[in-house]
Amino acid sequence: MAHSHTSSHLPEDNNARRLLYAFGVTAGFMLVEVIGGFLSGSLALLADAGHMLTDTAALLFALLAVQFSRRPPTIRHTFGWLRLTTLAAFVNAIALVVITILIVWEAIERFRTPRPVEGGMMMAIAVAGLLANILSFWLLHHGSEEKNLNVRAAALHVLGDLLGSVGAIIAALIIIWTGWTPADPILSILVSLLVLRSAWRLLKDSVNELLEGAPVSLDIAELKRRMCREIPEVRNVHHVHVWMVGEKPVMTLHVQVIPPHDHDALLDQIQHYLMDHYQIEHATIQMEYQPCHGPDCHLNEGVSGHSHHHH
């Protein structure tokens, strides 16, 4: 069995710095919105603070991923500590679902018994929240040519949260102009649905990763077909297992090949193929000269299992 590795590049310091600044801005204004929501009586502000919590958590996980990716693996933790960010994402997703349910429940109560809402204060805080989101987005997007995945994902989170702040501003304007307070719980429910969408996606992705599911973006049947088609010596690919450790995909696979003139060169070619086409830096490849026999040979097999090249 042959083990192939390539050294992964550590995240740049300015990625971590940008994440840290954006985290500070977002977390700070989230607290302002929570306090403002209670003082003004606005549920829409509290819902937007819940939405900001999704951003704060996304930024925190991105920061943790940067930190943990720098910590070397140990004898006990051979993959390092990257899975901790997945566990944190799972806990965060559940917390967000609970927060959303509580806000929707409170919104329904407010339809039955409306409460006064301080429109002016609500407006001021919602505008400040919008500016904070714009600042966070600029911090993350500015100089993103390094294309760090964590930073790009966090920027998308913040962009989504702009909608929450806009919603709170609309509710505040309606209350200031018309005094119609039901605008507040209506907008808070709409913002809660945005939070629930983010939370559901986070929950689904983190559960898939914790259960060692293959990355959603990777089509294993297509990978097997392409390897058989594009590497002439490869006749069959089977026993493919792919899972994620943090952001890094890890793969093991068996490859039936025509006996090569240079075993190591072919191994190197397969390794580089996986890295160039699928960004898989860590693959354990078992090369075989005989067809696979046994009940597990057709595991995760599409049509690819029967692709052969005749030479």
Curated annotation (Swiss-Prot):
The chain crosses the membrane at residues 19-39, 46-66, 88-108, 120-140, 158-178, 180-200. SUPFAM superfamilies: Cation efflux protein cytoplasmic domain-like (SSF160240), Cation efflux protein transmembrane domain-like (SSF161111). InterPro entries: Cation_efflux (IPR002524), Cation_efflux_CTD_sf (IPR036837), Cation_efflux_TMD_sf (IPR027469), CDF/SLC30A (IPR050681), Zn_transptr_ZitB (IPR023500). One of its GO terms (molecular function) is zinc ion transmembrane transporter activity. It comes from the Bacteria. Signal peptide: none annotated. Residues 40-45, 109-119, 179 are periplasmic. It is a multi-pass membrane protein. The keyword Membrane applies. Its main location: membrane. Keywords: Cell inner membrane, Cell membrane, Ion transport, Membrane, Transmembrane, Transmembrane helix, Transport, Zinc, Zinc transport. Pfam families: Cation_efflux (PF01545). The keyword Nucleus does not apply. It is found in: Cell inner membrane. Residues 1-18, 67-87, 141-157, 201-311 are cytoplasmic. GO terms for cellular component: plasma membrane. Belongs to the cation diffusion facilitator (CDF) transporter (TC 2.A.4) family. SLC30A subfamily. Involved in zinc efflux across the cytoplasmic membrane, thus reducing zinc accumulation in the cytoplasm and rendering bacteria more resistant to zinc. It may contribute to zinc homeostasis at low concentrations of zinc. This is Zinc transporter ZitB.
